[in-house]
């Protein structure tokens, strides 16, 4: 298989003993993570958006299949997903919390992809917390849909392109963790 076609699946089962449980959160977690090997030149928003569209297409096909199997399931997902950055959400809803911004925009659009999560916004606060040593805050996204049964914005997927050396250094510095930075020269 060529580069970009290599996938790695991780299946995690965990107990989150401190989780606050509700309709969508439980103490037991069955989480599937997928990793795709990409080329350096694919570290960009266009590649991320194409990946989001592929995942969203699968979600819509699953919804359609379930609606055929069970006649009481209504189709609620729109044909297309709407992309928006956390900064654009803040500009649209400056007086609301990040979760309220997601709710209002998801309710208006049906399915949204919130991008660029983790860095500080104009108000000095991040939209949501993200580890500085995992995804590149400029190249990550959450797929969120409006779920009318519970009248909520429901996150279905969180994804991102991993940090490279430059993004790692910048994000560790912004997170106040420069002590975690090292180079291969320092290890000698």
Residue ranges and their predicted role:
Residues 4-31, 139:
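Conserved alpha/beta core surface patches that mediate binding of polyanionic ligands
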Residues 46-63:
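Long, well-ordered alpha-helical scaffolding segments within enzyme catalytic domains
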Residues 86-184:
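A translation/RNA-centric and nucleic-acid-associated enzymatic feature enriched
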Residues 16, 39-41, 118-120:
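Short acidic/polar capping segments at secondary-structure boundaries
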Residues 31-35, 181-184:
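Active-site scaffold segments
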Residues 60-96:
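Alpha-helical scaffold segments that mediate packing/assembly in large oligomeric complexes
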Residues 33-44:
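A generic structural motif
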Residues 2-7, 185-188:
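Short, small-residue-biased leader/transition segments that mark boundaries at the very start
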């Amino acid at each position: 298989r060529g580069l970009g076609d290599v996938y790695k699946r991780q299946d995690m089962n965990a107990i989150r003993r401190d989780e606050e449980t509700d309709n969508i959160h439980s103490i037991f977690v069955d989480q599937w993570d997928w990793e795709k090997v990409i080329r350096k030149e694919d570290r960009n928003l266009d590649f991320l958006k194409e990946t989001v569209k592929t995942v969203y297409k699968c979600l819509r096909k699953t919804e359609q299949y379930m609606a055929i199997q069970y006649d009481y399931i209504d189709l609620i997902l729109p044909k297309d997903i709407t992309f928006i950055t956390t900064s654009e959400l803040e500009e649209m809803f400056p007086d609301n919390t990040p979760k309220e911004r997601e709710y209002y925009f998801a309710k208006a659009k049906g399915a949204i992809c919130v991008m660029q999560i983790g860095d500080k916004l104009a108000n000095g606060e991040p939209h949501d917390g993200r580890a500085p040593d995992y995804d590149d805050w400029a190249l990550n996204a959450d797929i969120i849909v409006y779920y009318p049964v519970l009248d909520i914005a429901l996150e279905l997927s969180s994804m991102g392109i991993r940090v490279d050396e430059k993004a790692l250094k910048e994000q560790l510095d912004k997170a106040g963790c420069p002590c975690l930075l090292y180079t291969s020269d320092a290890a000698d």
